[in-house]
């Protein structure tokens, strides 16, 4: 295997997952201590605010109104996905840096929200994007942002790979 990285593959990128996890947890700790529930601090009028919200469901509060079983379902899913991401990361070759970064971002975000879900029973969200008082995107957090960026990078890699037979970036 000419492009192999060795026994541990691209696991050296776990530092990025750890960084995402630390920033995510530190930011949640900060905003939970600074804000009351649903309080808004306007950063950019009519566009961007800090707020505090708890999400017992998944993305966009999916299943948030359920009786509590969803906490463990989503925790199990996050654990399974995290395990798959670590194995995938380990198996990457030397020329798959773009993919390694994408996987590390998703993993760090998944672990950040997993910690909240298990330790607190809900995920702490604090970023609110809106247009005046007419449209509000659901509140989210740093972990969600890392997952989204990583997922977009994975999609770009997949589309490029399908089209040309090679990865988007080295």
UniProtKB/Swiss-Prot annotation:
UniProt xrefs under InterPro entries: Peptidase_A8
What is this enzyme's catalytic activity, as reactions? Release of signal peptides from bacterial membrane prolipoproteins. Hydrolyzes -Xaa-Yaa-Zaa-|-(S,diacylglyceryl)Cys-, in which Xaa is hydrophobic (preferably Leu), and Yaa (Ala or Ser) and Zaa (Gly or Ala) have small, neutral side chains
The protein's location, in the record's own words, is:
Cell inner membrane
Bilayer-spanning residue ranges: 11-31, 41-61, 69-89, 95-115, 136-156
Membrane topology, record value = Multi-pass membrane protein
Taxonomic superkingdom: Bacteria
Molecular function terms, GO-annotated? aspartic-type endopeptidase activity
Q: In which pathway does it act?
A: Protein modification; lipoprotein biosynthesis (signal peptide cleavage)
Please name the top-level EC class of this enzyme: hydrolase
Gene Ontology cellular component terms for the protein in this record: plasma membrane
Residues of the active site: 125, 144
* GO biological process terms on file: proteolysis
| Principal cellular location given in the protein's record | membrane
Q: Does the record bear Ubl conjugation in its keywords?
A: no
The alphabetized UniProt keywords are: Aspartyl protease, Cell inner membrane, Cell membrane, Hydrolase, Membrane, Protease, Transmembrane, Transmembrane helix
| EC number annotated for this UniProt entry | 3.4.23.36
Q: What does this protein do, in the record's words?
A: This protein specifically catalyzes the removal of signal peptides from prolipoproteins.
Which HAMAP family does the record associate with it?
LspA
Which family does the similarity line name? Belongs to the peptidase A8 family.
Q: What is this protein called?
A: Lipoprotein signal peptidase
